[in-house]
Structures are given as C-alpha cells and as structure tokens.
A protein has these predicted regions:
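Substrate-binding/charge-relay-adjacent region of secreted/lumenal peptidase catalytic domains
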Residues: 1-4, 9-248
C-alpha cells in the first residue's frame, strides 16, 4: 500500500486471485511480428492473462477504479529512430548544440522561446525533473550525451534511478532503452542544472501505474513526464475495440 492508500498491492497465487476475482488466468502464445512500417520485429512470447472481467463484491467495487496485474502482457513499445553517423556538434557553453539536419534541444529552446530564461540564469537549478520509463536506463549514456555531444556542463550525480517493482531489468535497445535515454537526455539538456529522478518499472500495466504512484508518493519531482504509451486518439480507439479497459 502506498502512503496515500490509493494504490494497494496484493500478493498471492494465480489460483487465489482466480478465486477471489472470479476469473480464470490462462497461458497465451503471442506470435512473432516481422518488421513493418519502420518498426523493428517483435519476438514470439508466452504470457498469462484472463478473458473475464474481474469481479468484486458490491460493498467495495464502487471504490475501486481498476484491477491491474492479471496479465504480464507488455503492449507498450518504443520505436526510436537513430541519428545517422557523421553528424557534428558545436562546442558551446550554453545548454545547446548544433547538428546537421536534425532537431536538437537548441531548436526546442528557440521554438519555445527558452533562450531569454537562459540569459536570466534560469537553467533548472534547485528543481527536480521526474521521468517515468518502462525500459532500463544507464545514467552514463545521458552523461556522455551531455558532456561529449552537447558539450554542456552538468552537475555530478544529478541523476537518481528508482527501480519500481524491481525495475525493468538491464538496459536493452530491444526493450526500448533508447526511449529512456532520449527522455532523460533531452529534458536534462533543456534544464542542465536540474536534478533528475528516473522511475523505471517493468513493462506491464501495473508497473506503469506503480511508477506514477511512486513518483506522486515521494513528491520529489517538480515535473513528471513519460513518452511511453499511446495518444488519446489511439487509446479511445482501443477502448472502442475492447482492447483496452477505459478505467486504465
């Protein structure tokens, strides 16, 4: 149970949950998906889940928004696009850089008129950025990007990694760690003096929810962001197709 009592973690066997929630969990074989539309291939997998909606007694059902964790299916995926080799960066003390033919934090700062803030010395000092991700993150990757690609000065030890529910495992491009790197690198470049807390969780529905509950309970981050998931348009279409629970 989290301090706010809004997220309650329950433990038990599959049979106990089947009995308590009136469901029947089964094993499902997910076929492999070949590469298509610029997205990499997905390997075949075996997952567990249930086709039935969980049931709760009428005395407590109105207070429960959703029951998560009856499946370990991981539908979220990251599809990063790699920058071609040979790009160059300029050596500058400002939180910016220049690539050839690619958008950068400097472009974001210009388009959203952040440069006046930098000139006034507002660079995130004393603030904390929170990033939620579902793939392993290595702080050394972001530090290399800031120091050797953007050539900006950042504070030592500015990144804290919080493994929610045991974490997602070791960093892996296949699992989407490139997306984790991107989130931290870009936000940290725009606010070079801010601290960063990375909440990394297993790639499951309950892992995603627990990461946000953990961040809210700790109340350390001044802002919290995540690039995992789908847009509202896609989510609503999934709900209409009974592929997604509207409560989730």
């Amino acid at each position: 149970t989290y301090p706010d009592d809004l997220d309650v973690v329950a433990n038990g066997t599959a049979g106990e949950f089947d009995s308590a929630l009136n469901v029947q969990q089964q094993q499902y074989d997910i076929p492999a998906v070949p590469a298509h539309d610029g997205m990499g291939p997905t390997a075949a997998a075996q997952v567990h889940g249930t086709a039935q909606e969980p049931y709760l007694p009428a005395s407590i059902a109105p207070a429960v928004l959703a029951i998560l964790g009856l499946t370990n299916y991981a539908p979220f995926a990251a599809h990063p696009t790699h920058t071609p080799k040979g790009v160059t960066s300029s050596n500058s003390p400002a939180p910016t850089t220049t690539y050839t033919g690619n958008l950068t934090p400097a472009d974001f700062a210009t388009n959203y008129d952040l440069n006046p803030l930098y000139r006034d010395g507002i660079t995130g000092k004393g603030e904390t950025l929170g990033v939620v991700t579902l793939a392993g993150f290595d702080p050394a990757t972001a530090e290399y990007f800031w120091n050797n690609v953007l050539h900006i000065t950042t504070g030592a030890g500015r990144i804290t990694v919080d493994n929610v529910d045991g974490g997602p495992g070791a960093p892996s491009e296949k699992a989407g760690s490139g997306e984790s790197d991107l989130d931290v690198e870009q936000s940290g470049a725009l606010a070079p003096d801010a601290s960063i807390v990375v909440y990394q969780a297993p790639n499951t529905d309950y892992g995603f929810a627990d990461a946000f509950f953990t961040a809210a309970s700790q109340n350390l981050a001044d802002t919290l962001s995540s690039s995992w998931g789908e847009s509202e348009t896609i989510l609503l279409a999934s709900v209409d197709a009974d592929q997604e629970d509207p409560a989730y």
